[in-house]
């Protein structure tokens, strides 16, 4: 199965950003707060309050007003909105400006559905336009009288044309979501979330003292459990009245650090029975805050013992004690993402943060050709979530559209450029009453590494949303983005940033193991899910966990081939140099051999002339000439772009390449390899023939790996065997004699010319001139091949 390269490639687009005001690529920061998105014009209608002034008809005094707003085929209403005690709603409705010519506002009596009055506004002449930072349009009272029913009402509202820059945009009820239940409209609104920063809590259980078992005739076998929130960890079992553990139990907590760690000592009486012999609880605020890489002091803590284990017959106070180190490790960065997709490396304490490096700005323009997981559903209620650091941004939900337009702009502070911005697009399942328990469905993700983004450029591209499954590579649509990174730091702070530590110093002074980092990352994801689920509107747990989902570690032949090709690309240049040198030795032609000897002779005996050539003006003139030729070649290659860059600083950068199909082995996909990659563990494949075929294929691959590993081990064992020969006295005597002869040659050849002659003779022998040529193996190589290895001992 071959993938279409053009279909899955990043395409360059040319939107009218910010109405094309100002430069496309400013050199000194953004021109406005919304210059990375296209301007969208909306008709805003703010319905604030209604007043009933009916005095003639007593029945008209009892009125439940409902406001209906109509523009073209779109209709919105306050029917399902909660009404205040003074008949107030204070709700903003937003309509697409191009959907009609006349805006109709109708006031009705809700129970009887009686029309009280109607107001029509012509869009072309009667509605003002407001562009921030202009002051907001003042609301007006509109008389809504009905002489037939004796209703005398007044409606307070305001109508104006605005854009997505307007302050009411995040709280507006858009016309495309008019069918959404009023209680669910909040789930369609854009929002920015700040996830609480995370911190490690280190509980080091050192030892116990004077522990008492429930069974007075038995030596206690105790382990310690510590619980913080929903996470419980325990130590190994240690026996004795004064057991020792010296074991770290590490938790993840979020700011503010207000939790409590509950510690219990469990006595293992036998294989099936256990009993608690002591408890202790400590608040996080009572622990030692470590703001530098260090260790907390070890202190003794009295344990609260159950009554059944207290010593009898002694009225004096007796307490078992537990020696522990309790600290909040604030000098670490808590990883919630995998290393490849990390967006933040800062420590918990702000005093250890590096200086601000720059600003990242993202304009989420829209999407095209979206496909959901449910093929029967023709439309999608989509929204985008962008995550960088602890700041999450969520766009509004565009209802019933496979090509939504958002045009929302967000920005982040950047402290490390070697990070990744993650954007995910999801199908909103929370906007209908019958979808209360449904989860939002992920459509796909786009990741942008910042180290590939050049500063002060605006990248306007359409990124494919790719989904790889057992059936192959599938395109779920395209996400249109405008990306810009602007440096804030200048001078030394900017140019020294690539050389500073990527992680806080504590990660290098007291590093955590990969196993610990993976376990703590799982804790961090759960805490983030819980914290963001408590916001309003909630960023659901399935969305957060999907955004923080790490790379799969399942076995994949496709990725194995990919990693081999990457490794081969890295060492290909070294292999090329080795092959060139080997070809000089092995060739029978005299020309390359004499060229090598000539170059060696010049560098050995004519170094004075080389020094004169380097320090002369001739070399400087040649370098300047080469620079001029290179610049002229670039200018003549693309004269239009050079002209724009010189006079307007306006050059369209090339699109960011986020996925290399050929590198990832996605240009020609083997479906069975994909099926094996996405198979569960243990395998859920029931066809024995397929399992046998996969097993035989893996055996063939591992056969080559086995032989390669065996050859490498054999050569390494022969090298070790050469050192073991030094244990024999005869070999040691010969080695000392050779060392003495070598020193004698060096001393005799200490004269500069003699040493150069010796080196030149060695080079002549090494390049194998015709009179030195011998196709038989060298003596040292013969000796090395005769050294023993453990391969002879294997059965």
From Swiss-Prot:
InterPro entries per the UniProt record, alphabetical: C2_dom, C2_domain_sf, C2C_MCTP_PRT_plant, C2D_MCTP_PRT_plant, MCTP_C, QUIRKY-like
GO CC annotations on file: endoplasmic reticulum membrane
Residues reported in the UniProt entry to bind Ca(2+) 1: 57, 109
Amino acids binding Ca(2+) 2: 57, 109, 113
Record's bilayer topology term: Multi-pass membrane protein
Compartments reported by the entry: Endoplasmic reticulum membrane
Transmembrane helix among keywords: yes
Domain of life: Eukaryota
Transmembrane segments: 590-610, 612-632, 730-750, 752-772
C2 domain: residues covered: 24-142, 180-298, 341-463
Keyword Membrane in record: yes
Pfam families: C2 (PF00168), PRT_C (PF08372)
Gene3D superfamilies named among the record's database cross-references: C2 domain (2.60.40.150)
Free-text tissue specificity from the UniProt record: Expressed in root vascular tissues and meristems. Observed in flowers.
Gene Ontology molecular-function annotations: metal ion binding
Keywords of the record: Calcium, Endoplasmic reticulum, Membrane, Metal-binding, Repeat, Transmembrane, Transmembrane helix
Required cofactor names: Ca(2+)
Entry's family note: Belongs to the MCTP family.
Task performed by this protein: May function as a signaling molecule by regulating the trafficking of other regulators.
Protein name as catalogued: Multiple C2 domain and transmembrane region protein 12
